[in-house]
Amino acid sequence: MPSSAVRRFTDSDDYAAAIRATRAEITVTGRGHFTAKLTRIDLHRLRMQRFSDNLPRVGHSAVMNGRAIISFRTHPGPSLLWGGVETKPASITRHNEHLSEFIRVRLLGAMSLPVEDMVSIGAAIAGCGLTPPKDALTLTPSPSAMAKPQRLHAAAGQLAEDAPEIIIHPEAAWSLEQALIEAMVRCLAEGELGEDRSALRYHVLIMHRFRRAVEENPDQPLYIPEPCKSIGCRTGRCGHAARSSWG
């Protein structure tokens, strides 16, 4: 049944815990009073989320939910990183199905479909394969193509806030869902693939290993050289990997 919810937060841990179908952690890196808003919209098969928070931060998200996920920026601004992939205001990102990524994006929209639906719809609408990629991919559609899902996503978020009764109406939800799916698939089909990010993906792998090394020693203080040594990586390289992965 279609539904929606809009929640506001002043605690980053509560915000991370509320993100759907993920184990998320957020570390705020800037000074100030943290505030965030999370909008969740479920139509029939399509699920949507809108994320907005006010302070610089680094996040880690691990998702295993059998859905094909795409995301894009909801507001203009400088290029940022999600899982080693540069996210630009006019780009759209296809995520791998079992993603585990470091995130430095604060104003973000996401949509997902069951994997089998994404595959069949991609073939039917655009004649292309949309099975989730092995590694996250960033695509740049034409500005006019990208503007449509951004506009529809923003409108859905506004309805969730101001007129949630429209979203729960089955026919209205179906019409909105079809428009969003078509706009999303058109962007994915025509988008220009971003440059090879193999070096960034390697840096993200180093950060995952570093994170595991820290988690294996939760009750003792660790100095940076110790986990670097345990994962077989020089301290300088770990630092470079952190900067390229987290920004």
Regions found by a protein language model. Name each.
Residues 1-33, 79-225, 229-235, 240, ...:
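Alpha-helical bundle regulatory/interaction domains
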Residues 75-76:
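Extended, Lys/Arg-enriched charged tracts that mediate electrostatic binding to polyanionic substrates
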